[in-house]
Amino acid sequence: MPRRLILSATERDTLLALPESQDDLIRYYTFNDSDLSLIRQRRGDANRLGFAVQLCLLRYPGYALGTDSELPEPVILWVAKQVQAEPASWAKYGERDVTRREHAQELRTYLQLAPFGLSDLPALVRELTELAQQTDNGLLLAGQALESLRQKRPILPALSVIDRACSEAIARANRRVYRALVEPLTDSHRAKLDELLKLKAGSSITWLTWLRQAPLKPNSRHMLEHIERLKTFQLVDLPEGLGRHIHQNRLLKLAREGGQMTPKDLGKFEPQRRYATLAAVVLESTATVIDELVDLHDRILVKLFSGAKHKHQQQFQKQGKAMNDKVRLYSRIGQALLEAKESGSDPYAAIEAVIPWDEFTESVSEAELLARPEGFDHLHLVGENFATLRRYTPALLEVLEPRAAPAAQGVLAAVQTLREMNADNLRKVPADAPTAFIKPRWKPLVITPEGLDRKFYEICALSELKNALRSGDIWVKGSRQFRDFDDYLLPAEKFAALKREQALPLAINPNSDQYLEERLQLLDEQLATVTRLAKDNELPDAILTESGLKITPLDAAVPDRAQALIDQTSQLLPRIKITELLMDVDDWTGFSRHFTHLKDGAEAKDRTLLLSAILGDAINLGLTKMAESSPGLTYAKLSWLQAWHIRDETYSAALAELVNHQYRHAFAAHWGDGTTSSSDGQRFRAGGRGESTGHVNPKYGSEPGRLFYTHISDQYAPFSTRVVNVGVRDSTYVLDGLLYHESDLRIEEHYTDTAGFTDHVFALMHLLGFRFAPRIRDLGETKLYVPQGVQAYPTLRPLIGGTLNIKHVRAHWDDILRLASSIKQGTVTASLMLRKFGSYPRQNGLAVALRELGRIERTLFILDWLQSVELRRRVHAGLNKGEARNSLARAVFFNRLGEIRDRSFEQQRYRASGLNLVTAAIVLWNTVYLERATQGLVEAGKPVDGELLQFLSPLGWEHINLTGDYVWRQSRRLEDGKFRPLRMPGKP
């Protein structure tokens, strides 16, 4: 059986692709004086040009010119220009094969190159094995191999040799990974791992299948079941630190492979691979279960507290009429008493003139019942659901292993007290139980004259545990999401080395004194400028008075002439089925090749099957209904393909392919240069089985839902999407989309609405090199912060909220740099850190320092906003693109009433990724045909004003059929370079 190739044909072409852009040609193919002197020794244009081209190829990519080599025209033109030869002479070069070979030999001597021999292969494999222990991506390994060989200056071998070296390196790395996971295991460990492949008692599924099931709902019953899963994993008792020295990418991939395989398939593996795979599954699944347990506990508490608050409000509303009646009655009585005092008459008679004395006495008793204590709130109602918590919290506290920072030691001590009480079946809280963690609003309920109230002591401790887990003051052993704060950051030694070498990956001056001096000087200048403009009433389209700030709304940005062009071009776009559109776009871009097999990296063999699975995600139809709507497909086929070919990383790579094509398309330049972007959240209601996984945000009503948070470039390409809880502020995820997309976009300026900004985001955006420009609602209520106090800027008094605490920034400067560097290098995601900062119940030093830094940037931005109408227009236009994209997404995601009905978070992510990929495909297809439509208008004698092209949008879908049977007609495929005919005006 022949060895499976690591590299696909497309990847081979990519690796040896020649530079074509002007920048790359200058970088790789610019001759020095010595080169030109050697080249000029050739006689005739053909020989000079051919010799020079061979010199270029031997330098980069590093291979010799073949007899059948086809070179891009830009290469020939660039080389010919430098050697002053006619480009047409290239066709004559090499008519004598001897000449070509003689030139190649002379150049090898000149460049001091040697051919790559078989004796060089072992060293290359050893070098690649180190990288293969981090990733088994063939393209990355081959790219590293070529780069390494270029530095050593041999002539590159055939790619089949590179492929062989990569394959051997992956095999060696796999054996090392297996060995690292299996050697520490005892016979007892292996026996327990084998047990996981057996049927669970009284069930038709194996232990491993049951253990990997996600909890269905946030309630005590499913919580207890999930706790049992964690206990089962803990019984396996893998050696401490197992897998710690294996790169997380490889460990996660091995665990995913094991998770997708049937127990029968796993049982067929040779022992070392089987035990290594099972160990990886147990390690990853244990961390997942711990994270899910903490999340479930959080959601149950949030649900109980929300229910108590709602009940409290309902009770208050019911009593509102009675309270109002009493207030009106006592107002009349009070007025009668005032009049009686003035007249000197009997006050008791005055009361009885308003209400009989017996009724007055009764009303006083009723008022006492209606009255509430001074600190009255909904907390006392939470106690009504104490039984719900008691069903699972003893077991939860038993299986979790929390650790605490000094600030949360009191909470940890309270948790330990609860564990001891549960173990000893104590009903009363010990008198010496820790109480320092109890907040003032809890004290009246917890600390009573009879002692510590058991019910409210436990609820308070569990609530504070939830808060401390969110902020990171408490972490859990074995968790991924709830780790020690310091573990998320770059190691202190590595950060110190980067700073010492001036290699921090940040966009600012790392010297705190110089940085702060520059920013504060700029802030002073901007404050002075805006003060002068405001005082002279010269702020553009804005007025600042003692009563506040007023900004004139922007006028319509689309002229009537542009609307006429929009209508004309939209009528010309060909009508097309969504299936044919996806096939067209895949023919242009090859995005489907990125959906590689999880195990061997092979491309999907059946393109229509793959596109059906993607479309099933995008239109919210699901695999079952998709199989019914697509002739020749079955659920089993689609399910298998999704399990092995569709993952977050394959969706991300395919999306990057589409975004890059949009970025490079000439017509897209009319909308922007790819350096600005916007982001916005789009809520989808959670229904059916997905309802229990949804979150509630009062902003969207009382129904649960999910938010798809999407970033879109100024060229309309949606380059990132995330599924997030509707209860989390949009600003948490703004940076993730900018930092972790895989496209070639280089975003410099980013726009959001009000929900997309916080001071922490302003700070991190600036540190990481992005200009942040949110459209802030009620801007006059968003305060400025100044260096010298409000008295220095009397004109701006209505806008000033306080003085900057620069001392705090200086004190935590290194912590700020370390945090930002960690986010930039991917050690931790920005969203995780921002969630933790948003959860701090106290004034954490780093959080406060970052906030102060953000206040500087926010103040500078607002001052810029007040001075620049152009900035306001730019932000407004960018956000409008995102809102228009949301309309397209809503139209595509039409099945199941547009509701999220998938129970697992993984499936919900696939829905969002599929939707984003298909909308990106629609954008690219529309861009191509909008260009053809404008060309068609010109050819028809209807000139198009180039200034109006910026107002066209590739987000229309009226011409796209999204419904019906999903038939993939290979016969409708267009030939290379061919396009569908435009519609004739006036025809459907």
From Swiss-Prot:
Keyword DNA-binding among UniProt keywords: yes
Domain of life from the UniProt record: Bacteria
Keyword annotations of the record: DNA recombination, DNA-binding, Transposable element, Transposition
UniProt GO MF annotations: DNA binding; transposase activity
Record field: transmembrane: none
Disordered: annotated segments: 678-697
GO biological process: DNA transposition
Database matches in InterPro entries: DUF4158, Tn3-like_transpos, Tn3_Tnp_DDE_dom
Membership in a protein family: Belongs to the transposase 7 family.
Function: Required for transposition of transposon Tn1721.
The protein's name: Transposase for transposon Tn1721
Organism: Escherichia coli
